[in-house]
């Protein structure tokens, strides 16, 4: 999907200038994980004003920071502290859901507009662009209003305070004092194994909505493995962890395309029904629905090849350095 990049967003500070985000070589697991959490918490705080101002891509970036934090707390709960991790995972899930409603409306509208671009004028029957705009504009407005309400809520204020408390350290989980080079690769390996199991399950799921749902679970697991590897890259072996994270990002990306097409297909169907009930010709929406179906099928096939490359043993050898 091509996204307008004519606007720019002030980026958060680079990790090197945020206090406590450069763990020493040979550091404990707690130090490495807290460093990663501080980077993401800083990003979350930095982006809030941009989200409130409706700056381009700010919701997406804040959502990514929220997901990274949530993935880290889920993956490294035995390092931070299980009780803190469980509570913050739930609260970050709430924030991510609010951000997601606003972001998904943006992405889906842009996806459908782009999908319509190559359609010959003679096949654009009726007020198609206006109907697409009318379908998504109120949804985006409602989602944005709900997001701003969430950012103004005491719940969000408490979440930021809890993040400040936990990231201030020290990490108090049972594995916090163990060497990062032993503990973190094992945690990434566990996240990867979950993605592997889900991919195997998706392959054996009959085509249709059930497989679409299964592939969406694979995508979430690949994203979690990617973010876990990013956190592990702050300790040894950093280069190998970053390489693995890039492979998981490829899996996440192709499955994201597939999922977007599934949602776009559903939206095209809803648009067609609305057009029909309004007495309009629904031909173009049927064309759009089939186009999205074909695209989803292609990206699903692509995902199998991308997964095979990403899951090669050479991308995972560094995980076997972990003790246990």
What is the predicted function of each stretch?
Residues 1-324:
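Cationic, histidine-enriched alpha-helical/coil surfaces that engage anionic ligands
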């Amino acid at each position: 999907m091509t996204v307008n990049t004519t606007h720019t967003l002030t980026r958060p500070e680079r990790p090197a200038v945020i206090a406590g985000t450069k763990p020493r070589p040979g550091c404990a697991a707690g130090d490495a994980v807290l460093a990663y959490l501080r980077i993401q918490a800083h990003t979350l705080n930095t982006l809030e004003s941009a989200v409130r101002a409706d700056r381009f891509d700010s919701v997406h970036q804040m959502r990514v920071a929220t997901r990274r934090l949530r993935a880290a707390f889920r993956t490294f709960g035995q390092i931070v502290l299980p009780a803190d991790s469980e509570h913050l995972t739930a609260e970050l899930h709430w924030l991510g859901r609010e951000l997601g409603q606003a972001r998904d409306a943006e992405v889906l509208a842009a996806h459908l507009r782009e999908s319509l671009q190559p359609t010959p004028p003679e096949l654009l029957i009726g007020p198609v662009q206006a109907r697409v705009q009318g379908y998504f504009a109120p949804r985006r407005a409602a989602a944005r209003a709900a997001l701003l309400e969430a950012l103004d809520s005491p719940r969000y204020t408490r979440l930021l305070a809890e993040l400040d408390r936990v990231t201030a350290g020290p990490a108090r989980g049972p594995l916090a004092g163990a060497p990062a080079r032993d503990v973190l690769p094992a945690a990434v390996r566990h996240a990867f194994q979950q993605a592997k199991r889900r991919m195997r399950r998706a392959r054996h799921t009959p085509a249709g909505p059930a497989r679409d749902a299964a592939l969406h679970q694979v995508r979430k697991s690949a994203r979690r493995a990617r973010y876990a590897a990013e956190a592990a890259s702050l300790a040894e072996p950093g280069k190998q962890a970053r390489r693995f994270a890039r492979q998981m990002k490829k899996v996440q990306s192709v499955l994201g395309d597939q999922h977007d097409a599934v949602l776009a297909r559903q939206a095209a169907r809803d648009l067609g029904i609305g057009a029909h009930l309004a007495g309009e010709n629904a031909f173009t929406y049927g064309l759009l629905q089939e186009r999205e179906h074909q695209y989803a099928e292609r990206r699903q096939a692509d995902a199998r090849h991308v997964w095979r490359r990403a899951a090669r043993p050479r991308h995972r050898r560094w995980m076997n350095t972990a003790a246990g």
